[in-house]
Each structure stands twice: as structure tokens, then as C-alpha cells.
């Protein structure tokens, strides 16, 4: 089964605005770059992932993605996340991919074993595999097979909406709860938790150690 990983990326200098009270703009930019690099390194050379597709309107993010061997789609204007993901999925479908894995670039603890766990649950389509955030409100990873089976509905409360869409489509629903997939960096308390786990300081933007 061929799976493409789609990684949506906000402009590196604008992402993580809710951390503005904790990190400076330069520190947030550096953090966003490190998180993207970690995500790309985690996905690279995984036999379960045929191709990585990064979608962004930030030339710097797209250039970094290409340095890691990823394909890129540059957004025109300022489309909503769900619209950008739909366009990226169409690109993946042109290459006859069977499934797509949407993976935001703000999961500092994600490992290759996490990716394998998601793909393992995607056997025998039609299937939708969802990894919720630690509050079980948002969607931190979404694997859809076949690609295009359900509409994207990211945003506050997206976990339940994606579950509902999977059931409405008659797909098997698989929910994967893993601590490393549940923690995304959105709020100051998320950053504090990661720094505490890794024994780092705020001035040292975190990237999880690569796991083979």
C-alpha cells in the first residue's frame, strides 16, 4: 500500500503566535524550523511512506523541505488549512497513492515507531486512522485510505468531527492514543511540558532525538 505524508506548514516566522509571551519572534522562528526538520527526518527513508509532500506559502519552509527530499506545493494566497490539504491530496492522487497521512509539523516527540503504528492500523481499507491531541479535542495525525475518502475538517474540535465523518463514510475507524502523538506545541504549557520532559531550557528550542 502506497502512502504519501502531507505536512502542512505555516510561515516559519508567524507560526506559534500563542507562544509569544514565552518566546521571542526569532526563537519561535527557530523553533518552527527545528520542528519541521524533525518531522521531515522522522518521515524520511521510512519504507511505509512513499513520498513526503509539504504544503506551505512560506518559501523558506518549502526550500527546507526540498533539502530533505520532499515534494512541495506552494499555496497561492492565504487558503484555509482544509482547502490547502484538499489541494495537496489531489496532487498525491495524481501519483496513484492509496492513502494519505496528514501530519502537522508541531509534534516534538513523534518517532518513526509512531508512524509505523499509524500505518499498521490502516490495513484493509476503507479506513480512517486518527491520533487525537492529549485533550482529545484536536487531530494530531490523520491517515485516510483511500485518499479523499472523507473531507478534512481541521480546527477546534476536529477529532470528533473526523470520527463522525469516518463513520458516515462507512469506513473502519481506528483511534491511536500515544503520548508522543498527543503532545503538540500550541500553548505555553505544552512547551513547558516538553522542556520538562527533555530537561531543556526555554532558550533551547526542542527537537526530539531521532529514533531509528
Residue ranges and their predicted role:
Residues 1-19:
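N-terminal nucleotide-binding beta1-loop-alpha1 segment
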Residues 101-103:
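Short aromatic-hydrophobic micro-motifs that form the base-stacking/packing surface
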Residues 47-72:
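Acidic donor-binding segment of Leloir-type glycosyltransferases
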Residues 64-99, 179:
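Short phosphate-binding loop-to-helix
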